[in-house]
Amino acid sequence: MQHRVSIAAGLDAFVVVGFVAIGRRNHDEDPGVVGLVETAAPFVIGLVVAWLLARAWRDPWGWQTGALVWIATLVAGMLLRRFVFDEGTAASFVMVATGFLGVFLNGWRLVARMLANRRSAAAA
């Protein structure tokens, strides 16, 4: 079980940082690590909050966990970005973030469950 928790946490972090990296690249932002960390910080903090709220370690690959992690990461990240980090939260940005994070935070979980079910069926 601990193995699944580690994989889930790593994949979730990869999705969040990947979202930020792609966004920075598409907007011709400085490709340096410092800029990436500064931009990713509210969403990474949001992800940690989301994991705690969802108790994601209990069922890290579950669809309910994915949905809660997605929404909580998005909401916490946007609130932190706007009110703590004093950065923009334009409607178009919120929509893109909602779609990207929704597809990828839930998508990898869907694929993982399908593969696990397939292995279970093959072993039976």
Where are these regions (language model features)?
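Membrane-helix boundary elements
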Residues: 2-35
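Membrane-water interface at the C-terminal end of transmembrane alpha helices
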Residues: 3, 7-8, 102-124
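Small-residue packing motifs within transmembrane alpha-helices
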Residues: 6-8, 42, 62, 93
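Alpha-helical membrane-inserting segments
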Residues: 15-27, 45, 49-57, 76-80, ...
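Membrane-interface helix caps and helix-loop-helix hairpins in membrane proteins
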Residues: 28-31, 59-60, 86-88
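Structural signature of hydrophobic alpha-helical transmembrane segments
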Residues: 32-45
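Internal alpha-helical transmembrane segments of multi-pass membrane proteins
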Residues: 53-75, 91-98
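Membrane-helix boundary connector in multi-pass membrane proteins
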Residues: 80-96
